[in-house]
Curated annotation (Swiss-Prot):
UniProt xrefs under Pfam families: Ribosomal_L2, Ribosomal_L2_C
Superkingdom: Bacteria
Name under which the protein is recorded: Large ribosomal subunit protein uL2
Listed SUPFAM superfamilies: Nucleic acid-binding proteins, Translation proteins SH3-like domain
Alphabetical keyword list: Ribonucleoprotein, Ribosomal protein, RNA-binding, rRNA-binding
Family annotation (Gene3D superfamilies): 2.30.30.30, Nucleic acid-binding proteins, Ribosomal protein L2, domain 3
UniProt-listed NCBIfam families: rplB_bact
GO molecular function, one term: structural constituent of ribosome
Listed Basic residues bias regions: 34-55, 270-282
Gene name tied to this protein: rplB
Entry keyword annotation includes Protein transport: no
Organism phylogeny: Bacteria, Pseudomonadati, Myxococcota, Myxococcia, Myxococcales
Length: 282
């Protein structure tokens, strides 16, 4: 993937960059592998906003991705590389030898015509899926399960990769893109290689309208609101927030507080993540 730049014909065009989509080989998705997506506008079943800054956006169909890679020993040929509006990574359409078709996330180095396979004793090459116990130490991986057979949960965004660091006592230690080192059972599956569309994080949106196409609404500062709308609102001119600590629109303290509540899985974290560190370039 490469980034396309424009001549500065307008203030938005001056700094806008887009993907060139050179790797895309098929425009329309496989209809049987798609589902409708119903927009929520960030609202729950009662109609209340539970997630701010969501609304609008282009109509999409969800592409059903094979997260489990459970067709062990059945070779599949890469039929196409496609765009997926629901994620940053590209997806690959696989045609299995038995006639079944499935989507997977497309790693770097996988092209149309390649043959991929999953199983315990397959080759270590990009796109193949194996149990972690059969993967050599130091191998670059993505699409990692957190429990055997649960489907991939970690390392799924464009350009990301993890690295197998150690194996001990039925568990394997994997360094995640955030710098966190996490333990998973050695029977969990992972896919070899780094995910494609590596320069996705370098794309510059350029204008507000493009964010609206993506379904992202504006983020308004609490300081710019009225007192009825936010605890930071009101005052004459550019006055301060008026609180000893910044708070959310609902009065909860924000900024600098821990947001992780899932203590149940703390025992699987060997090394905490390092803020500002991300493995997306090799």
């Amino acid at each position: 993937m490469a980034l396309k730049e424009y001549k500065p014909t307008s203030p938005a065009r001056r700094h806008m960059t887009v993907a060139d989509f050179a790797e895309i080989t098929k425009a329309k998705p496989e209809k049987r592998l798609t589902k409708p997506v119903r927009k929520s506008g960030g609202r729950n079943a009662h109609g209340k906003v539970t997630t701010r800054h969501i609304g609008g956006g282009h109509k999409r169909r969800y592409r059903v991705i094979d997260w489990r890679r459970d067709k062990d020993g059945v070779p599949a040929k890469v039929a196409a590389i496609e765009y997926d509006p629901n994620r940053t990574a590209r997806i690959a359409l696989l045609h299995y030898l038995d006639g079944e078709k499935r989507y997977i996330l497309a790693p770097v180095g996988v092209a149309v015509g390649d043959t991929l396979v999953s199983g315990a004793d397959v080759d270590i090459r990009p796109g193949n899926a194996l149990p972690v116990r059969t993967i050599p130490l130091g191998t670059v991986i993505h699409n990692v399960e957190t429990a055997p057979g649960s489907g991939a949960k970690m390392i799924r965004t464009a350009g990301s990769f993890g690295q197998l660091m150690a194996k001990e006592g039925g568990y394997a230690q994997i360094r995640l893109p955030s710098g966190e080192v996490r333990k998973v059972l050695q029977d969990c599956k992972a896919t070899i290689g780094q995910l494609g569309n590596v320069e996705s994080s370098s794309v510059r949106v350029g204008k507000a309208g493009k964010s609206r196409w993506l379904g992202i609404r504006p983020t308004v500062r609490g300081l710019a609101m009225n007192p009825v709308d936010h605890p930071h609102g009101g005052g004459e001119g550019k006055s301060g927030q008026g609180n000893p600590h910044p708070v959310s629109p609902w009065g909860q303290k924000t900024k600098g507080l821990k947001t992780r509540n899932n203590r149940r899985t703390d025992k699987f974290i060997v090394t905490r993540r390092r803020p500002g560190v991300r493995n997306t370039q090799r």
